[in-house]
A protein has these predicted regions:
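Short linear loop/turn motifs
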Residues: 15-16, 158
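Short hydrophobic/aromatic-enriched beta-strand-loop microsegments
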Residues: 9-15
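Short acidic/glycine-enriched loop/turn segments that link adjacent beta-strands
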Residues: 15, 36-37, 127
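C-terminal catalytic lobe of FAD-dependent flavoproteins
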Residues: 78-168
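Flavin (primarily FAD) binding-site architecture
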Residues: 1-7
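Sec-dependent N-terminal signal peptides of Gram-negative outer-membrane/periplasmic proteins
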Residues: 18-20
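Active-site lid/adjacent beta-loop-alpha segment flanking the redox-cofactor pocket in flavoenzymes
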Residues: 8, 22-119
Length: 168
C-alpha cells in the first residue's frame, strides 16, 4: 500500500516456523530460553513452542508456507536437548509458518503519518515485535488520528522521516 503513494519502505517478509512440542518430563519452571544459535523455546499452555531466528544471511526462502521439519530434526531439537536435558525426548505435536514484516533499516516499527500524504499513517515493519507492541501502538496511532498528536506515548522517534533520511 505504501508503494501506491511512492513510499519505498525497507520492509520485507522473513519466514518463521513455530514448532509445538511436548515432553515426558516437563521442566517445572521453564522461562523463555534463547540459545546463542537463535534457537528459542517457551512454555505454551500444556506444551512448548520453539523455533529458530536465523541470521539474515541464513533466512529461509519466504515465498512459501512450507514447514521445514528437517530444520527441527537437525537444528532445533538437538540444540534444545543440549540446553535443556528434559528435551532429549520431545514429541513434535504440530507446527505452523508465518511471515514477519522485517524492517531492514533498524528492525523497529515505522509509525505515524506520512509527511506529505494526508490521512496516510504507517504502523508496520515491527520485525517480529508487533504482537508485544500492538496495544501501545494501537493506542498511540488512535490518539494521533483523533487528536493530531501523541498523548500517552511519544512515538515520533519511530516516524517515517528516519526511513526517508536512511537514519536508523
Amino acid at each position: 500500500i505504501a508503494a501506491m503513494i511512492g513510499a519505498d519502505l525497507p520492509v520485507r517478509p522473513r519466514k518463521r516456523i513455530v514448532y509445538v512440542f511436548d515432553c515426558r518430563d516437563k521442566p517445572e519452571r521453564a522461562p523463555l530460553t534463547i540459545d546463542p544459535t537463535g534457537v528459542w523455546c517457551r512454555p505454551e499452555g500444556a506444551t512448548f513452542i520453539g523455533g529458530i531466528s536465523p541470521a539474515e544471511s541464513e533466512d529461509p526462502d519466504c515465498t512459501d508456507f512450507e514447514i521445514d521439519y528437517k530444520l527441527y530434526e537437525d537444528v532445533v531439537w538437538p540444540t534444545l536437548a543440549q540446553r535443556i536435558p528434559a528435551f532429549e525426548a520431545l514429541k513434535l505435536v504440530r507446527a505452523w509458518v508465518g511471515h514477519y514484516d522485517y524492517n531492514t533499516l533498524d528492525q523497529n516499527a515505522i509509525l505515524g503519518p506520512h509527511p506529505e500524504v494526508g490521512n496516510f499513517y504507517f504502523a508496520n515493519g515491527f520485525s517480529g515485535h508487533g504482537l508485544q507492541q500492538s496495544p501501545a501502538v494501537g493506542r498511540a496511532i488512535a490518539e494521533l488520528i483523533a487528536y493530531g498528536e501523541y498523548r500517552s506515548l511519544d512515538l515520533r522517534r519511530f516516524g517515517y522521516e528516519r526511513v526517508a533520511k536512511n537514519l536508523p
